[in-house]
Design a protein with these regions (language model features):
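HotDog/MaoC-like acyl-thioester-processing domains
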Residues: 1, 64-97
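Short alpha-helix capping/helix-loop boundary micro-motifs
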Residues: 56-64
Length: 97
């Protein structure tokens, strides 16, 4: 499965407030998107296509993700990765039902 998503400032602020994130890297002119936010979005996408909940997830973070970037979420029932528009690997990992 391959899906694309651009994360806007409103989505980021909503997430940061909901988890009470105060990390200065996640705010400002060119904020870094928290890795857990990317994993949250990825899991929501997974749940849209597969009926079984996840019981295990392992992720390796490779590069920072920046606001207003268009991300490519690629996943199947066993593995996932997220890249930016330049195909820079942001994170990759595996999961199990």
């Amino acid at each position: 499965m391959k899906l694309y998503k651009k994360i806007n400032k409103a989505d980021l602020i909503d997430y940061l407030q909901s988890v009470k994130d105060t990390n200065s890297l996640h705010y400002g002119k060119n904020p870094i998107i928290p890795g857990n936010f990317l994993l949250f979005i990825l899991e929501e996408m997974y749940q849209e296509f597969y009926s079984m909940p996840l019981s295990y997830l392992k992720a390796n973070f490779c590069s920072p993700a920046y606001l207003n970037e268009r991300f490519c979420f690629i996943f199947n029932q066993n593995a996932f990765q997220i890249t930016d528009r330049n195909q820079t690997l942001i994170l990759k990992g595996e999961w199990k039902q």
